[in-house]
A protein has these predicted regions:
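PAPS-dependent sulfotransferase catalytic domain
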Residues: 1-184
Length: 185
């Protein structure tokens, strides 16, 4: 299997695309790529239902999925969790295409986009619900990379819009995936 290695990095308070460099893609992996708040969990549920549907355990549809760039887990925990998944895996990413390994036709890529104002409204709700503990943990890990912390959201939509444009930029995301649109996978 041929893999094009990343040529850039995607670093936010919550995400670090460099973590992908420690992973080995399997030929039957499914990579679900969306900008933040653009249908990722929905598509994970669709893919998981197709791969692991069980009337006995609806929650099982999320068992074979992981979010490699999420800073909350150690890289070794991520590697171990992915290695333990039997069968096909789905990997969630918000990273642009140039920031993750992109394989040939053996790996399937599913891209999902959402209307920009809808995605931003969802980002407002998402950030408003961050617990202080979760925000502190993510900010601490991001500080190691010299990133500015996410402040507690207190209703300043204009500042949050700047954060969303920087960290969730759907235009950059699409611009990096668009040249790959004619690939078989």
């Amino acid at each position: 299997m041929w893999v094009r290695e990343p040529t850039s990095e995607f670093l936010t308070v919550a995400e670090d695309s460099r973590r992908w460099r420690h992973l080995t893609l399997r030929p039957d992996d499914i990579v679900i790529s969306t900008p933040q708040k653009s249908g990722t969990t929905w598509m994970q549920g669709v893919v998981g239902s197709l791969l692991r549907w069980s009337d006995d355990d609806l929650g099982g549809v999320f068992l074979g999925t992981a979010w490699p760039e999420f800073r909350a887990d150690s890289v070794q925990d991520l590697i171990d969790r992915l290695a333990a998944i039997d069968g096909r895996r789905s990997l969630k990413t918000h990273s642009p295409a140039d920031c993750i390994p992109v394989a040939d036709e053996d790996v399937c890529y599913v891209l999902v986009y959402r209307h920009g104002p809808d995605a931003f409204a969802s980002w407002i709700n998402h950030r408003a619900r961050f617990s202080l503990e979760a925000l502190a943990l993510l900010n601490e890990r991001a500080a190691r990379d010299g990133l500015d912390p996410w402040p507690t959201y207190e209703g300043d939509v204009a500042s949050l819009f700047e954060e969303w444009q920087r960290d969730c930029n759907p235009v950059r995301h699409l611009a990096t995936w668009w040249p790959l649109r004619d690939q078989a996978n």
